[in-house]
A protein has these predicted regions:
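Polytopic transmembrane helical bundles with strong interfacial aromatic enrichment
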Residues: 1-148
Length: 148
């Protein structure tokens, strides 16, 4: 396969998911780090950075999930899910739900009379762990984490 052939790159059965998934992962993890920094340093700028990173991560997770589902339907022709692929799918959906839940907490706190709840930090830690585990399994599915 020629790496410069746009048709083969864009129409590969799973390529879009592999490309798109890195954006919400990175943005979410950076937003969690900024939120912890905002809490620790009491700096409002980190709150703002966390919110905007989280917003983009949440919205970017939608096409990432959609392309993941399409990759399963196209590449595996919709066959029954099992093993690592099933776990990756379930954790991916859980990750997306957690990212949106954390975003919603931040979105609600943008109103002047609301403050961010303290339980968001353990929730963000849990979400980051679920995202990391999902990504780890995705690495095995893509062959990146394959045994040498």
């Amino acid at each position: 396969m020629n790496p410069f052939d746009l048709k083969s790159v864009l129409l590969a059965r799973h390529a879009q998911h592999v490309v798109l998934i890195h954006f919400p992962i990175a943005l979410f993890l950076v937003s969690v780090a900024c939120d912890f920094l905002a809490q620790w340093k009491r700096a409002a700028v980190f709150d703002t950075v966390a919110y905007f990173n989280l917003s983009v991560a949440a919205f970017a997770s939608v096409p990432a999930v959609a392309t993941g589902l399409m990759a399963w339907r196209w590449q595996l022709e919709g066959q029954r899910l099992k093993g690592t692929l099933l776990l990756h799918l379930l954790l991916g959906l859980a990750s997306t739900a957690l990212i949106w839940l954390v975003w919603w907490l931040h979105f609600r706190a943008r109103k002047p009379e609301r403050a961010l709840p303290l339980y968001r930090l353990p929730l963000e830690t849990l979400a980051a762990a679920v995202v990391a585990l999902t990504a780890h399994l995705g690495g095995f599915l893509s062959g990146v984490n394959a045994p040498v």
